[in-house]
């Protein structure tokens, strides 16, 4: 369709300060395909049973109908996690789910880091507007609610990628290769000058080794510099039909599944999954 051709041409939604250029028309991206409080929506769901150790004992990738109980904001969830009495009362029907969700996200995050996921410090900035005029630029600090959603999204993406890989179905993977040799050599030399030393072949460092290095600098004045230098060493993540794993996340299989409204690869993956579910 012409709509699909235009979505493919755009590839993704683009976010500017105070403005969005959507991949799909706003009637779809902000209404018919968007989650709305008290309104049923058709979805693809990944239902997971996750143990206290972060291991998934079973999962189900299925079509479903969901109805959002509340339209929340990151700020409101953060305030609930900080035990804001007004919001705890206002959202009394879901407050326990929010606390349970955050605790679960910490379990997922811990397991991923143990598997080699690198915890970079964000060097992004937030542009503060007032009547379309820039009034401030602040460092972006990831909140607890944002961490929680990110952990759940990464876990869903991981499960979907693994599901499709082991079924040997056509798929679009998000691959991230090992760091370039010359870049990692420069990084190793810099941190060794800071009295941190690596063992073994520096050109074949697993991601958990680099994560341990980064963790050793946490709380120090050197941490932002080390994190920034390590981030510059990383290769660019790419979309490919073959699976080679995601180095930065420490995952054997990974894809982009969770944002079909704003990323075309996610939309295409939803189509592939639905065809498989319907036996096509």
Give the location of each predicted region.
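Electropositive polyanion-binding surfaces
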Residues: 1-280
């Amino acid at each position: 369709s012409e709509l699909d051709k235009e979505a493919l041409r755009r590839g993704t939604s683009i976010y500017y300060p105070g403005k969005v250029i959507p991949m799909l028309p706003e009637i779809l991206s902000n209404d018919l395909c968007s989650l709305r409080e008290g309104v049923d929506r058709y979805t693809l769901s990944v239902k997971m049973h996750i143990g206290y150790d972060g291991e998934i004992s079973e999962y189900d990738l299925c079509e479903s109908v969901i109805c959002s109980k509340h339209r929340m904001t990151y700020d409101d969830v953060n305030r609930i996690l900080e035990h804001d009495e007004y919001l705890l009362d206002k959202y009394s029907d879901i407050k326990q789910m929010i606390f349970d969700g955050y605790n679960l996200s910490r379990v997922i995050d811990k397991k991923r880091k143990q598997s080699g996921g690198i915890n970079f410090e964000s060097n992004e900035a937030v542009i503060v507007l007032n009547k379309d005029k820039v009034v401030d630029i602040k460092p972006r600090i990831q909140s607890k609610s944002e961490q929680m959603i990110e952990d759940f999204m990464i876990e869903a993406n991981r499960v979907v990628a693994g599901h499709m890989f082991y079924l040997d179905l056509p798929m679009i993977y998000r691959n991230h290769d090992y760091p370039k040799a010359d870049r990692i050599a420069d990084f190793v030399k810099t941190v060794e000058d800071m009295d941190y030393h690596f063992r073994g072949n520096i050109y074949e460092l697993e991601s958990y080794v680099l994560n341990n290095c980064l963790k050793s600098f946490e709380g120090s004045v050197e941490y932002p510099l080390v994190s920034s230098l390590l981030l510059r060493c990383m290769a660019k993540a790419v979309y490919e039909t073959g699976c080679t794993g995601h180095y930065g996340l420490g995952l054997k299989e990974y894809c982009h599944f969770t944002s079909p409204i704003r990323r075309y690869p996610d939309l295409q993956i939803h189509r592939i999954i639905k065809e498989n579910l319907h036996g096509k």
